[in-house]
């Protein structure tokens, strides 16, 4: 119910189909349609294939962390944990994914996108090829780097599974460039990008926008205790324990969160202006340099990843 306060919402569902599921845990298109029609503030729909922090892994929300409101919203029976398996049951291959996306778009009338961590690139080649040949597919793609954060993932996943954002995004973007369809997709970056320099870095790689999670949580008091799944969050951010929730004062924390967003935007605008641009989307891979392997020299992202974002090429041509 806190979503009904005026903000626009991207409704995301993953393998558990929480909020849009049948009693057996399968996806319910009827419930999604009903949800969208009843809540006009839902502006986009996002299908989470995987997340960068734990790609391919299953997850659980323990029953002791679910209030009655959460249980009803998710569609979970009393006394049961909320389980999200490591795979989708509504589709099993690329063709079925595209059909699934188009069906949701048709019956909701909303933009539909996908969020995914990156591993093998074979499936991305297949996806790009079939998007081009069928003229169907997602309106936007969220590339979630391995830096993506969660307090509930296994350490082995967080530390070793998945590809970091810059490598992941550049690899996928170049595949779509190869098929000439990168301009048909809105690109969103995710994974520890909530700092001014990282925002510009992501824009230079070709992102149209970024997602922010961890940094926003830090602004309201998260101390990265990684106890989210234990219901013992000491700062009150990720717990249903009433006593611990007292550590989170909404009136105070909302101001701090607002300050964070304002300062982030301010810093990005100032850096952009200092570099001679009017908008951060004007940055290209040629503008960002990083230390090379020996640490004694610099290399531009353009040379490292061997591409320029198409939108930047068009801007340069128009200028």
PLM feature segments, named:
Residues 1-130, 137:
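Active-site-facing alpha/beta catalytic cores
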Residues 4-12, 135-137, 144, 293-309:
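Terminal amphipathic helices with adjacent charged low-complexity linkers/tails
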Residues 11-50, 163-164, 169, 173-174, ...:
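Phosphate/diphosphate-binding loops
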Residues 68, 74, 86-89, 155, ...:
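Flexible, active-site-adjacent loop/turn segments at secondary-structure boundaries
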Residues 75, 88, 93, 233, ...:
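Short capping/connector residues at structural and topological boundaries
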Residues 83-245:
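Glycine-rich phosphate/ribose-binding loops and adjacent secondary-structure elements
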Residues 221, 249-319:
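C-terminal extensions of enzymes
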């Amino acid at each position: 119910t806190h979503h009904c306060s005026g903000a626009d919402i991207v409704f995301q569902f993953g393998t558990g189909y929480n909020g849009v599921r049948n009693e057996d845990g399968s996806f319910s298109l009827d419930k999604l349609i009903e949800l969208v029609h009843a809540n006009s503030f839902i502006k986009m729909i996002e299908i989470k294939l995987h997340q960068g922090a734990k790609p391919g892994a299953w997850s659980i929300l323990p029953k002791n962390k679910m209030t009655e409101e959460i249980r009803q919203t998710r569609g979970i029976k009393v006394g049961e944990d909320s389980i999200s398996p490591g795979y989708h049951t509504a589709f099993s291959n690329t063709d079925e994914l595209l059909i699934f996306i188009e069906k949701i778009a048709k019956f909701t009338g909303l933009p539909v996108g996908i969020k995914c961590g990156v591993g093998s690139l074979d499936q991305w080649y297949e996806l790009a090829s079939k998007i081009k040949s069928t003229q169907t597919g997602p309106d936007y793609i969220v590339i979630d780097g391995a830096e993506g954060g969660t307090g509930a993932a296994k350490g082995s996943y967080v530390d070793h599974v998945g590809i970091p954002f810059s490598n992941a995004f550049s690899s996928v973007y170049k595949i779509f460039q190869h098929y000439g369809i990168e301009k048909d997709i809105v690109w969103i970056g995710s994974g520890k990008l909530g700092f001014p320099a990282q925002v510009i870095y992501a824009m230079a790689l070709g992102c149209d926008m970024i997602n922010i999670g961890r940094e926003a949580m830090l602004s309201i008091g998260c101390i990265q205790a990684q106890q989210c799944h234990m219901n013992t969050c000491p700062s009150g951010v990720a717990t249903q324990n009433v006593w611990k929730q007292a550590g989170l004062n909404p009136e105070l924390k909302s101001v701090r969160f607002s300050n964070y967003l304002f300062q982030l935007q301010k810093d990005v605008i100032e850096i952009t202006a200092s570099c001679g641009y009017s908008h951060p989307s004007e940055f290209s891979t040629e503008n960002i340099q990083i230390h090379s392997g020996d640490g004694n020299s610099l290399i531009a992202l353009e040379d490292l990843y061997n591409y320029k974002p198409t939108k930047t090429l068009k801007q340069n041509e128009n200028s």
